Structure formats: structure tokens, C-alpha cells
Amino acid sequence: MKTKTYRFVCLVASVLTLQLMNGSSAATPPPPPNSKNSSTSCNRTCGGISIPFPFGIGGKDCYLNGWYEVVCNATTSGSSGTTVPFLSRINREVVNISLPEGNNEQYGVVHIKGPVTSLGCSSNTSQVPQKSLPDLNVTGKGSPYFITDENRLVAVGCGTKALMTDIESEILGCESSCKDSKSSQEVTNLLCDGYKCCQARIPVERPQAVGVNIESSGGDGCKVAFLSSKRYSPSNVTIPEQFHAGGYVVVELGWYFATTDSRFRNPLGCINLTYSGSYLSGDSCLCEYGYFSEMSYRNCYCSLGFTGNPYLRGGCIDNDDCKGPNICEEGTCVNVPGGYRCDPKPKIIKPAKPLVLQGVLLGLMGLLFLVVGTLGLIIFIKKRRRIISSRKFFKRNGGLLLKQQLTTTNDGNVDMSRLFSSEELKKATDNFSVKRVLGKGSQGTVYKGMMVDGKIIAVKRSKVVDEDKLEKFINEIILLSQINHRNIVKLIGCCLETEVPILVYEYIPNGDMFKRLHDESDDYAMTWEVRLRIAIEIAGALTYMHSAASFPIYHRDIKTTNILLDEKYGAKVSDFGTSRSVTIDQTHLTTMVAGTFGYMDPEYFLSSQYTDKSDVYSFGVVLVELITGEKPLSRIRSEEGRGLATHFLEAMKENRVIDIIDIRIKEESKLDQLMAVAKLARKCLSRKGIKRPNMREASLELERIRSSPEDLEAHIENDDEEDQVMEISRE
């Protein structure tokens, strides 16, 4: 509640008149400060905070007197070049400055940073209260400041007793407790009612100095007390540590435009104040004149319909009141100084109706038929073009080649009725929105989609196809049509009538294994048991491709990014863009080298002959990733061991493989079991393909490792001397 502004009654006006008449011969009334200079040549912002006159930064013409001087200092924290404003006379950082606004706010407001008094919050055990800043004191000759009743004394913590000091009239305070009971102190903030927090009002006489003292009334822990503005009160006031760490709170100071000379006749911006203290009407601003603490003061504010700074000449600017909605419902709004008026709208005389409308109606009907016919023709042409384009794209995207492959394939299982239209897939993927992207690969981009029936799908949109890549796309369709295995991604259908070919797969929700292994932000860390199961499932899928499918299929790009994980973290082998099938009697393929560095078989790289053992080598790298949790290529490792396979083989050779085991599984895994898998990985990474096991042997070995841990040591001891690994205990 703000204090009323007292105005002069006749007796006070008479006394002032006598004083002015007696003093007119002795002294000349002082001129008003140069408000013009203060507005044109002075900096009016500091650190993003507006500094309105009578406050100012710079020379003496920029502010009324020393009480209103603001210094713009560089801050010691935060980003370089940041500045903060300080009130020079009281040496406090300014948070906000506002001018009086009409009759409802009869003084201006300055928000400053105030101190926090704490007890038991620092590392030392001293029970002496600590203050982040000195107590607030705005006293002094000519001081226009006072502490408003918008502030509250607040105590936070268990058993915290806070008292206001430096107030002569009374002793005020409050006490908080951790017992769930209501405080007897009158409060208005229901979040601070005595439980862990209490508050007390500031006395209404507007003191200029208030100190805060804190005492412990029982209980340990951090306790704080402070004076704070209700406007800047935090939402959670039950945690004392956050106030102690912050080091300050915001305090509201009221200020008057004060002067000690009652002969100060004219205000800075308003010229309507009379000699006796009353004011005239009709100007852009108003001023009030009275007494407070035996000091004459004057507050000015812009009149209704004006905004700005009344302490500057011409500082109050007329508002355009006609910008508001529905100002004049039945007329035209005209802005006038300080308000607006509503002028009646001119009457509109409607033209007389034509006597003959037949010609106009006939013309409109003819135009309508012409428009309808034109639109129908345009629709027909567009539909025809779409059909031609669809046929063209179907042919260009390998539709004819696909039909030819299907007719020459002994066991083709592709259901040609599962061809999707482009409109279906656009609707399912929100027109292939970037928000739907699941991943990008060498062959194209994969989107998440949802069909009309609610089924979730993965849509692989190939890159712009040229003749060289067309065979790879058709090859992937043919290969996936021949595969029926629970650990291999299932092909649902395809779309060939778009500019770029599209494949539709079953949706695998948990993404690829590479991200789950190497993304540190992933909350789920795969256990050794899960990793071993994934390895067995991958081995089973590759065994099926190599020996159980209609034709042996070599994947040619086995890596963790091409291994997806379903909702139960089951493995699904994907991305068959570079895969090749061979006849039963073929032992290898001679092709251009394709694959991913870090996973590529060195024997294949040198000879360009890809065999089933090349897939085994890539599988060995995946096993090492599961064991170590490291990436296949890393700049962190030495130049010689930058590749994970080389790094792992050196560790096996030096009997220190235990040192490179993933720390996330090191403690919970069975060491004998893990070492047996490491030995299998070493065999898969043999430089010569003939020394590597085939995928069926690797799959059976992994099954044996999981199901028969008692036989592991015997198998390890029976290895060749070259591959032997010493037993390494956790100790």
C-alpha cells in the first residue's frame, strides 16, 4: 500500500507565499536543471537497463544531483564486455528504474540488489552470521530514497529467526520452523507461511535504513534472512542454499523528485504548476507538490493519453489511441492530443439496380462454362502427365528389370501387389519431413512413417538414381525377397513410380547398435548377457544368408550401423544395397571393392575377391566392438593401432585384453565367457581367410560359450600355440 501524497491547503500555501516574498529580495530562485542536455548528449542505457532522467550517466548535466548519479561499471563475472549500472551515492547495483505512472503511483521505483544474511551455510563451522553485502542504508542529506512497503523480511531454513534492526519505532521479525504448523505472523504469501520459511511486513513509515539480523532457534543446516521485493520473489522459497549461493536479492526503493528549496517554481517538463503549488489542466503532464520528512518534493507524471518522461521538456508523447480494437463501433476514430474522438461514418449511397440483367447473366453463365471446361481440361492433362511420369519413373527406377529378375529367380517371394503409391508414402511420412528422418546411409535416407491403419513402417528413399546404382537397388529388393529370418529386416513393399525409388521395411524402434554402444548420452547400457545374445543372433542371421537361403548371399557391409535393435534389443541385420548372391558351386565373387573401412577384410581389399570369410572378418570386428565398447576407427589410439582390429590383436598378443574390456560390462560379465568370445573374435580376424571359421562354426561356438561355460577352459587350452591367450584374472 503506497502512502498518500499530501497537497497544500490554503494555510500551507499562505506560509509558502510569505516565505517566497521574504526570500525574493535575498536570493534568486535557482533555475531548473538543463533537461535538454540530459536527453540529447547522455547515455541512457547500461547493461540493457534504461536510465531515465532525473537519473543519468556521465556529466553533471545528465542527472539532477549526486543522489541520482549512475555509474556504468564493467562486471567481473559473465561474458567479457558486460556492464552493470550502480547508484553512485549508495553503491548498489541497479536492476530496474521506473518513473511514477499517474495518480496510482505517487513515487518512482528503483530495484537494487540487496544483501543476504546467512548462518551455517559456508564450509567453516563458525556460527557468526555472514552478509553478502552491507546492510541497506539510504539516509543522508537530500536523499530521495526510502524502503517501500512492497518489501518483505524473509527468513528461510529450519529454526531460523530473523529480526529487522535500525528501526527505532518497533522491533519486527519472524521465525520459521520445520514443524508443519502455521506461523502467527501475518503473511500474504501462502508459499511462505512459517513452514521452512516466514516473512514479515515493512513498517508503513517508509524507513531509510533497515538492517537484518539472523539467529538460530534450533536445528542445523543453512539459514538465511533478507529483505526482498514481492515483485522479484522466487517461486521456491524453502531452499536457503540457493539464496546463499546467489549472494543477493532484489530490494525495492521508492524515490521522490526532491529539492530542499521551496522556491523551485517550475518543474522540468511540466509548466502547469502554479506558484502556490496547484496545477493547471490541458498539458501533457501533471505535477504534485507537498512535504515529506520536512523536505519539499515534486512528482510529475504524463497525463492520460500520453507516455514518456515528464522530467524532460517535451518528454510526454501523445499515444495513438485509435490503434486499439473497436474504439469506435459506429464511427471513424480520430486521434487528438491526449485522447480521441469518434466521427460518424459518411453514408454510402447505393447505386440503383440495373433494369436489364439478362445480358449480364448470360455472360456470367458463359464465363462459368468456360472456367469449368478449362479446369476439367487442366485436371485431365495433369492426370495424364502423372500417369506418363509414373510409367517413366517405373521404367527408369528398374521396374522392368525387377520383373525380369523375378521371372528368372527360382524362388521369388516378392508380392507385386505390395507396391505402394507415392501418395500413400507422402501421407505416411508427412511429405518426407526432416523430423521423420531415422538415419542416412550410402544408399539413401530412412524415414519413420505411419500407415492409415496405424502400422509403423520404415521408408527408405534412395538417392537420385543413375544407371550405375540402379542394379544395386533392384538387387536389394531381390535379395530381401528371398530372405525369411527373424533376425533380418523384413521387406514390406516398394514404390517405383516416384522420381527416386522407395523401399518399405518393418520399423525397428531402438535404432542401430552403433548408437547404443557408443553414444554416452544413451541411458541404457547393454549388459554382457544382452551383447552375447546379440552376437549369437547376428551370427545366426549370417549363417542363414550363407547356407540356408535359396542362394548363398554375401552381405559385404556388416557393421554396427547396419545392425538394428528391436523393442526387446533383438538384432536385425539390414542394408543389403551392396549384397551379392552366388551359385552353390561358387566360392567367391570378383567385384569392385566396396564396404566400410574398419570392417573391411584386408584379404578382399588386396585381391578384390569377396568370400563368405570376408563377412566373417567384419563379424569379428563387431564382436570386438561388443567386447571393448570402442569404435572401429579412432584418432585417440596410436597410428599403428588406430584400427580397432589391429588394436585388439595387439592386446591379445600381449595378454592385456582385460585392459581394453568395456568398463560398463567388466564387473558383471563372466570373464571366462568373455575371454572365449575374444578368442573367437581373434580367429575371425585372422589375416588369411582360410584360417577363419565359417559363420556356422562361429554361430555354434557362440551358442556353446553361452550354454556350456564349464567347457570353456578346455577349448581354450586346445587352441594352436599361435592363438593361445593366457588366463587373466580380475585381480
Curated annotation (Swiss-Prot):
Residues 709-731 are annotated as: Disordered. Disulfide bonds join C287-C300, C322-C333, C328-C342. Preferentially expressed in roots and flowers. It comes from the Eukaryota. One of its GO terms (cellular component) is membrane. The chain crosses the membrane at residues 361-381. ATP binds at L438, G439, K440, G441, S442, Q443, G444, T445, V446, K460. Residues 285-342 are annotated as: Atypical EGF-like. Induction: Induced by INA and wounding. The active site is at D557 (proton acceptor). GO terms for biological process: cell surface receptor signaling pathway. Residues 382-731 are cytoplasmic. One of its GO terms (molecular function) is calcium ion binding. It is a single-pass type I membrane protein. Residues 27-360 are extracellular. The modification Phosphothreonine is found at T591, T596. The modification Phosphotyrosine is found at Y505, Y604. The EGF-like region is specific to this family of proteins and seems to consist of the C-terminal of an EGF-like domain fused to the N-terminal of another one. Serine/threonine-protein kinase that may function as a signaling receptor of extracellular matrix component. May be involved in plant's response to pathogen infection. This is Wall-associated receptor kinase-like 5. The gene is WAKL5.
